[in-house]
């Protein structure tokens, strides 16, 4: 695991230079915002979900992002087919279990994705990760939830079971893999007032994972960059509407030097 400031910064540089193609099967609520975020950071998004074409699309992509935000049977089939193709090609698959505790249908879909596919990175909020880990967490809507009794244990349990990097995002972000944890403290409270920020972050993690084989470094780098963009946007915003526009501008314009100066990371071992 290489979490030096220089290594994390280089991943951002590589995203902008290589412009990776990120195939995102996301929800219809946030698809435009997700694509805009990827485009602003320098990646090339493609939002295809038709079962008839996902194999072809994944074959030309550098990473695959699966989002459970607005699930239906055909979309789940497309996710599974795309995931199998990505696995066969060695492309990283990133999974966002949006609202997994809200219904039995979502929970069963998430479990099938985790059992049938080799997932590289899972990103969710506290309730979502708690639900996947079987440790509870009271859901109060898609984006707000109480924490599971032991957040670190929940993330560690899920990471051990799936062999994936697990990212738990909220007021304080946690990334867990291989007995180690990284706390990321970049971000701003205004980010919680804008719909779809989690979906955008998961897609951004996909862009970073497309150019960085160290998946915990890719995840930490993307989360820190996203949080720093939120900090910059908050300086110019007057409310959620202006924040949304300022955030996209910050994703586009945040420099490697600003990224280096602003990182707020703490590493720790999981007992």
Regions found by a protein language model. Give the residues of each.
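Short pre-catalytic strand/loop immediately N-terminal to key active-site residues, enriched for Gly-Thr
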Residues: 156, 184-195
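Short, small-residue alpha-helix embedded
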Residues: 131, 195-224
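Conserved phosphate/ATP/ADP-binding segment of small-molecule kinases
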Residues: 106-181
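Charged C-terminal helix
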Residues: 6, 228-271
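Glycine/small-residue-rich loop that forms an oxyanion/phosphate-binding "nest" at active or ligand-binding sites
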Residues: 75-124
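Active-site cofactor/substrate anionic-group-binding motifs, chiefly glycine-
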Residues: 37-90, 95
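Acidic-glycine-rich active-site phosphate/pyrophosphate-binding loop
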Residues: 4-15, 164-186, 258-260
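Glycine-rich phosphate/adenosyl-contacting loop at the front of the ribokinase-like
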Residues: 1-44
